[in-house]
Amino acid sequence: MSGFVPSEIFFTRGVGRGETQLESFEAALRDAGIAQFNLSSISSIFPPHAKMVSKEEGLKKLSPGQILFTVLARNTSNELNRMISAAIGYAIPRDKSKWGYLSEHHSFGETEKVAGSFAEKLAAEMLSSTFGSTSQLIYDKEKEEYVLEDKILTTGNISATAVVLSHDEWTTVVAAAVLIVE
């Protein structure tokens, strides 16, 4: 059976502000560089053999109006002084023929580091559960990644955080994994 499997993936984030929730979301997508595409939300599998590329490299391969598959974390508020966060975490196994995981996290009151670390840990736990256990999952501070019996090669995250600055303004944050099918 044949199907299309994304061959590349890039990560991006953005913050937007506007008079309406929709305007702030559009501004966040523009800040992330992906407003000109039709975004289709998918679940959280990092495809086997997919290569991580920079946002700039990924965007060069895309055309305005193109349908893009994304794992999108999004948070929005108009509550004055409210801190909002959105993060995507990823965990990729050493064996590139296996799939990895992407996780989305949306929170209030968390810094970029806290939200990103939570999303990264969640992705690592989801991946380690496919190996049968999360109890042996260890965070290697020196390498800044999660390791499970030498099976996880790479973990990481991207996150965006913002504070609502005005009571008459909406603020939106997005973090996205964009999957490219060639």
From Swiss-Prot:
Binds 1 pyruvoyl group covalently per subunit. Transmembrane segments: none annotated. Its cofactor is pyruvate. The keyword Transferase does not apply. The record marks 43-44 as: Cleavage (non-hydrolytic). It catalyses: L-arginine + H(+) = agmatine + CO2. This is Pyruvoyl-dependent arginine decarboxylase.
